[in-house]
Every structure is written in structure tokens, then in C-alpha cells.
Amino acid sequence: DTFDIIKRITQDTINQVYPHYYPAGVVVFFQEHHNDSNILTDIAQGKVFVVQDKDEYIGTVTIDGNEINRLFVLPQFHKNGYGSKVMDFAEKEIFSKYSKIQLHASLPGKKFYIERGYSAVEYRTKKVCCDDWICIDIMEKRAPDVEKEK
């Protein structure tokens, strides 16, 4: 079902990619942040979208107002344009209602977001498990026609 697909994509991506960028405590933080309850709540509220290519589920994104959350593409599908297609979809959805998009950029995705025109507007740190620290950039992108602030 949808929950199992999203959980698998999210946790597999965190488990395979994030240890190359973060200490163990931060990886645990991401695993726990994207827990069953949060995923189920977002699904129930109609905020979650799944990317499918033929019969394979390869990615997911959550859209919450003007925020892009939980954007993951399975590692074996990286560098094939799927992330860009997911972002194209999410940006189109959000820009139809809002003049700017906001997201929290993890290290693995930061370069991707910069290349898509996002700029860091805030930097946050938080102490997590095992005396490790998570560092996150809050990034924004403005719509080409910045007239409609909804």
C-alpha cells in the first residue's frame, strides 16, 4: 500500500545515502523524524505524492502549503532526472497558489536545490543523539511573477 511504499523509499534512501554525509546520531534523527506516524498523517491529509516509472516506485515528495518536504528518490535511480521531475511537479503545484517555496535542505540535496535556484535564508543547528549535531539550511525559491503573495 501507499504507506509501505513511502516508508520504504524514505528509509532506504536515508539508510543508504545519509551515512556518507552525516554522523550516526544525525542519521538516527532523520530515521525517527520520518517515522510511521508522520508519514501516515501526511498521507491522510493528501500531502504525499509517489513517483512511479512503469511498475517501479522510485520516489516520493510531500507538499505542505508552500513547503516541500520528504523528497526522496531511491539511490539506484539517482542521476536519471527523476529528482528534477519530482521538483518540477512540486514547484508547479506550489507556485499555482504561493509566491515562494520553502524547504529544509539536507546535505545530500543542497547542491541540487542551489542548481534549481533556491537560496539559503536561514541556518539551523540542533543537538541530536550521541552528541551529534544536525545542520540544516532553510532554502527558498520565489516564483517568476512575485506579484501573488497568498
Task: Describe each region flagged by the PLM.
Residues 68-79:
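A short, internal acetyl-CoA/4′-phosphopantetheine-binding micro-motif in the GNAT/acyltransferase core
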Residues 77, 81-89:
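Conserved acetyl-CoA pyrophosphate-binding loop and the N-cap/start of the following alpha-helix
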Residues 99, 104-110, 116, 122-150:
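C-terminal "cap" of GNAT-fold acetyltransferases
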Residues 11-37:
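Conserved GNAT-fold acetyl-CoA-binding loop/helix
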Residues 45-59:
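Conserved beta-hairpin
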